[in-house]
Amino acid sequence: MESLAAALGHPVDAKLLILSADQLGSTHAATAGGFAALREGVATTGTVMMPGPWSRDAADRHDGADLGIHLTLNSHLDCYRWGPLTAAPSLLDGDGGFPRTVDDLWDHADLDEVRRECRAQIERARLWGFDLTHLATHLGTLQQRPEFFDVLVDVAYDAELPVRLESGRAEERAGFPFRRLAAEEGILMPDHFTLVRGGARAHLDATLAALQPGVTVVAFEPAIAAEEIRAIDPDAAQRMDDLDVLTDRAVRDRIDTAGAVLIGFREIRDLQRARR
């Protein structure tokens, strides 16, 4: 079977690297930080949270950037909440927003309402002018349970978009072969995925040192230094560190030294659509 790298026109042993700035639209700091990473740094793609209060600002500023949808069914912060775009009572918690935890959502979410909400987030993004390149799922909500994953596959297929899925032992933890199931529907996904959770510089260096052939996604959550993000997010310092790493001029040299080639999701999306 042809590798994704070869299908994209690269040597079969090429090390292709996608650096993602996640969660644009969630806060002003994350939106500004994401665009800084894309325009001034080495980020090659990003994701937008359409239920986020700053998603409209992200739409006004995107200027054709390689951006996907961070399909959002949770509102994980204690003092800063968002909820569904649709009328979806089963997707609300007692505070009137999305549930804070994945387990809470799984316990009472109606799958028809989940499907409508995911479609609405994609439709709003397109209405606002985003040229969507892929889908991701916030907190893995749509990945780790088969009935929810069915929704993700359905909306990805209809939208003709690749999906960012976890790799490694994630399928073992989930208990079902979600990567194979997506591939059977013609949905493309990168070969490897890692999410930075603190220590961004060391994490990226370790990833580059162990980089395998194929397409690898490293996801960051950059944010500018602002009182807003410090007040609402206990991980604010890590987000600011993510931005520092993504805009560090020396990082590009380290990427070159590792023999990696930077790409985005647009190439993968176009390949998937060409195969339909």
Q: What are these language model-derived features?
A:
Residues 16-27, 103-115:
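Active-site mouth loops of central-metabolism enzymes
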Residues 78-106, 234-237:
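Active-site gating loops and adjacent loop-to-helix segments of metal-dependent hydrolytic enzymes
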Residues 163-164, 232-276:
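C-terminal domain-boundary segment and adjacent tail
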Residues 9, 34-40, 56-68, 81-93, ...:
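Acidic (Asp/Glu)-rich catalytic clusters
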Residues 22-24, 49-53, 70-74, 138-140, ...:
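Active-site beta-loop-alpha junctions enriched in small/polar residues
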Residues 5-76:
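Active-site beta->alpha N-cap acidic-glycine motif
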Residues 119-188, 194-201, 209:
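Catalytic domains of cell-wall/extracellular-matrix polysaccharide-remodeling enzymes
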Residues 16-18, 43-47, 64-70, 132-136, ...:
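Structural preference for beta-strand elements that scaffold enzyme active sites
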